[in-house]
């Protein structure tokens, strides 16, 4: 069953219309050394039935594993209703329409999302989402520079305890923006930003300070101290947070005396399944004073000429919609389907449900850490408060231990030594509400067995 729509006669007619004698002539401008030539090793085409059979055979090779890995993407239970509704034809589309007001249902969902996210973060306003948590931080940094004209600095204080992947993305996004990223070290004994490290910097030296909560080690930062330090020194405070944790911890809008200026992060924990790194979505919230500098889009509620309530794109300061020089971002669209799922997840869970999930995550992670550190040679790296991740030190090479656990059907965590060689054979472990006592016992037994090999 071929699905190529054009007949040979139609192809000839199209070539004749543009004055080309053949397909090869059409692409003659491409230098020969750039052409791939014949694909001699390409197998014969398969029928739809044969393709389905092949995919089933390949899928049968997949191995499911018990997951104790986190480091930025987390396995949470997603109520069945979330994706049952999100995949309905009213929401499920290839692209958000350019005539956005024609899709009142989608706009209302985005509006409700903005309201929920702003409430969860205790901030004034939220945009309609960005690509992912890392790019959201990059946009937040650029936004902080735009909203801080009093500071002539282009320096951003970036903690080493921030997710290293986020740092790499931020470096890419700011490389040609005259932004200088300055490392802020962490306390080796506690795993959080070292207060004495702040004392080495002069007042007014930075345009913004990035504050992760929890940080990459799972440790809770002294957010009040950091936010107040930023404001005393004329810098914007940028919170990078786990949205699930904010149901239990103090939200960014309440940090210190004045609250954080911006809050961003990865929205994947809010109803988005793990899927080879994406698609996920990023969120970005700010003070009302900075609303005109928000990247992406902002949905607002209004009334039409007949007095009926409706929803519209109140702000869309992207370069496709306004003059390039006036645009605040080149973010092309938002992760509309992911935001729809997140809105449904938050609505179905409610404030109490989100708090219960967050509390269960913390309780399970605490139980996991206690269970694993009973094993000889395994110890916590940082004796500090954490949310649902913690670092443990192993008596053997962490990467080999992970490989041994994988052979036993367990994703044991994330090796930290690649980005933090000073920590030695440290492993970042995670437990969400989906991990029970039996899972932890299985992990502990497998870890003990691997360490004895």
Curated annotation (Swiss-Prot):
It catalyses: N(6)-[(R)-lipoyl]-L-lysyl-[glycine-cleavage complex H protein] + glycine + H(+) = N(6)-[(R)-S(8)-aminomethyldihydrolipoyl]-L-lysyl-[glycine-cleavage complex H protein] + CO2. Signal peptide: none annotated. GO terms for molecular function: glycine dehydrogenase (decarboxylating) activity. One of its GO terms (biological process) is glycine decarboxylation via glycine cleavage system. The lineage of its organism: Bacteria, Pseudomonadati, Pseudomonadota, Gammaproteobacteria, Methylococcales. This is Probable glycine dehydrogenase (decarboxylating) subunit 1. Its EC number is 1.4.4.2. The glycine cleavage system is composed of four proteins: P, T, L and H. In this organism, the P 'protein' is a heterodimer of two subunits. Keywords: Oxidoreductase. Belongs to the GcvP family. N-terminal subunit subfamily. Gene3D superfamilies: Aspartate Aminotransferase, domain 1 (3.90.1150.10), Type I PLP-dependent aspartate aminotransferase-like (Major domain) (3.40.640.10). SUPFAM superfamilies: PLP-dependent transferases. The glycine cleavage system catalyzes the degradation of glycine. The P protein binds the alpha-amino group of glycine through its pyridoxal phosphate cofactor; CO(2) is released and the remaining methylamine moiety is then transferred to the lipoamide cofactor of the H protein. Pfam families: GDC-P. It comes from Methylococcus capsulatus (strain ATCC 33009 / NCIMB 11132 / Bath).
